[in-house]
Curated annotation (Swiss-Prot):
It is found in: Membrane. It comes from Arabidopsis thaliana. GO terms for cellular component: membrane. Residues 1-35, 372-393 are annotated as: Disordered. PROSITE patterns: CBS (PS51371), PB1 (PS51745). This is CBS domain-containing protein CBSCBSPB1. The keyword Transmembrane applies. The gene is CBSCBSPB1. It comes from the Eukaryota. The lineage of its organism: Eukaryota, Viridiplantae, Streptophyta, Embryophyta, Tracheophyta. SMART domains: CBS, PB1. The modification Phosphoserine is found at S17. It is a single-pass membrane protein. Residues 23-35 have a biased composition (Basic and acidic residues).
């Protein structure tokens, strides 16, 4: 792995130092490249302060560990039963000696036509997988994972592998912060333009600067990260698993899209080979892809914002997302690491204004995204053991932070928009709405904001307490997102409002005009805060 962000100290750890509890070892996954051969681990830089987050404070998971003498078939069965796509291997002394992933199964086993019931995993595993120490800075470990393009990394403490770091979980935390920052930035730009129009003046900020904020940071689409020469592995539903596995090696891809009559009808990944073929003991040379593929997979278009693509994969719990053009032809398949790298690079390009040249774009992103806010310090009150290894049976929270929630809204062109916002402030939600459907909003007739409850009633959101009550109710019935509606009809005096105090089910009728005035006040507050923030931004960067 290439070093980033300045010099690092490293410590080579032999497998002999990894003695201890076999059951405490955690899974690691080799990425798409083959660079994870060294057992070198990076230590945290000197001068670590209490405010900097270390690896052991990130989301960690359990893993599966088996002897290297285990047959490939048995290993795959174990992985399938635990619903994991990688496992660690130990030698006769119970020392960590390798790792096996679903990609290894596809490219090193099936494509090579090995006998899975006779071949031990030691023949196809990646030896000496990379890992990090528990005191390593979180930003350093995450940065290395993105650059190296692998999702899982074992975490070592006192010579034992104690946990697994999954970059996908950490990524969504960081992206949620980046998205909120982007939303605030767009509100800043909009506020400045509004002042110019109202006062008939022109600030010292060139329009090109505002356009840069919009185009490079706030609205980058997948089309900006997909090369023109991208090759997509397209197969027929009647192709055999063996044929597709060989093509995966040829295309250096971990997935294939299944096309019927020029339309996307399925997706087949290396994880499917592991879970649905090998673990089920199906013959690859006789099994047709159409019997083991994921049918009618979710896809998106090239104009989809990068952050939106990440949300789609996160909510759908999959790692590959087909991308189509306007005609519906698949032009690319992006994975979570690919999109992450692009999102970080895009954010870093803009955020790098005025910063030291020695910092890399990814380092800036992780440093900013993982920085602790005052109320996050409460996380330290949790037990250290629960921070180290999270139970696989634990579902966990649906959202990256206790004070955030997911929202959906549809514009007048029937396009759906999804965003995550702070649940403590209606101003934050309004800012996000303006960002996405601002063209639908008449500034002289600001709409009411409503949400749809489980009875399909439209309930008013007119204050911070209304918002908090709505979120509490949504969580209590197991919802992961709240569907919002805008009503600019100035009719419907019978709209209902859920009170934050008292019974969660209590409702009261309110006058529409009164709440319209409240919305106007909130909107004015959002513009004022945004304008002040923009001026501070200009002073900081010398514009």
């Amino acid at each position: 792995m290439a070093s980033q962000g300045g010099p690092r100290r490293s410590l080579s750890v032999t497998t002999a130092s990894l003695h201890g509890k076999k059951k405490s070892m955690d899974m690691a996954e080799r990425g798409l490249d083959t660079g994870r051969r060294s057992l070198t681990v990076s230590r945290s830089p000197l001068g670590l302060t209490g405010g900097e987050r270390t690896v052991k404070r990130l989301r960690l998971s359990k893993a599966l560990t088996v002897p290297a003498t285990t047959t490939i078939y048995e290993a795959c069965k174990r992985m399938a039963s635990r619903r994991v796509d990688a496992l660690l291997l130990t030698d006769s002394n119970e020392m960590l000696c390798g790792i096996l992933t679903d990609k290894d199964i596809a490219t090193r086993v099936i494509s090579q036509e090995l006998n899975v019931e006779e071949t031990p995993v030691s023949k196809v595993m990646t030896k000496n997988p990379m890992f990090v120490l528990s005191e390593t800075l979180a930003v350093e470990a995450l940065q290395k994972m993105v650059q190296g393009k692998f999702r899982h990394l074992p975490v070592v403490e006192n010579g034992e592998v104690i946990a697994l770091l999954d970059i996908a979980k950490c990524l969504y935390d960081a992206i949620a912060r980046m998205e909120r920052a982007a939303e605030k930035g767009k509100a800043i730009a909009a506020a400045v333009e509004g002042v110019e129009k109202s006062w008939g003046t022109n600030t010292s900020v060139p329009n090109t600067f505002i356009e840069t904020l919009r185009d490079r940071m706030f609205r980058p689409s997948l089309s900006t990260i997909i090369p023109d020469d991208t090759k997509v592995l397209k197969v027929s539903p009647t192709d055999t698993v063996l044929t597709v596995a060989k093509k995966m090696v040829e295309f250096q891809s971990s997935c294939a899209v299944v096309i019927i009559e020029d339309k996307l009808r399925g997706i087949f990944t290396s994880k499917d080979i592991l879970m649905r073929v090998v673990a089920e003991n199906l013959p690859p040379s006789e099994t047709l892809v159409e019997t083991v593929m994921t049918q009618n997979p979710e896809s998106t278009i090239v104009d989809t914002p990068i952050v939106e693509a990440l949300h789609i994969m996160h909510e759908g719990k999959f790692l590959h997302l087909p991308v189509t053009d306007k005609e519906g032809d698949v032009v690319a398949v992006v994975d979570v690491i690919h999109v992450t790298h692009a999102a970080v690079a895009t954010a870093g390009t803009t955020a790098g204004i005025g910063n030291e040249a020695t910092n890399t774009m990814m380092q800036k992103f992780w440093d900013s995204a993982m920085a602790l806010s005052p109320n996050e310090d409460d996380e330290d009150s949790r037990s250290e053991s629960s921070m180290k290894v999270a139970s696989e049976a634990e579902t966990g929270k649906s959202f990256p932070f206790a004070n955030t929630f997911s929202f959906k809204i549809e514009d007048k062109k029937h396009r759906k928009h999804r965003f995550i916002s702070d649940t403590r402030s209606l101003t934050e939600v309004i800012t996000a709405i303006i960002q996405r459907v601002g063209d639908d909003i008449d500034p002289d007739n600001f709409p009411q904001i409503l949400y749809e409850d489980e009875d399909h009633d439209k309930v008013l959101l007119a204050s911070d307490s209304d918002l908090q009550a709505a979120i509490e109710h949504a969580k209590s019935i197991g919802w992961k997102s709240l569907r919002l509606h805008l009503d600019d009809s100035r009719e419907g005096k019978g709209r209902r409002r859920r009170r934050a105090s008292g019974s969660a089910e209590s409702m009261e009728y309110v006058e529409t005009d009164a709440w319209a005035a409240a919305y106007s006040g909130v909107a004015a507050g959002a513009a004022l805060v945004a304008g002040l923030g923009f001026m501070a931004f200009l002073r900081k960067f010398g514009h």
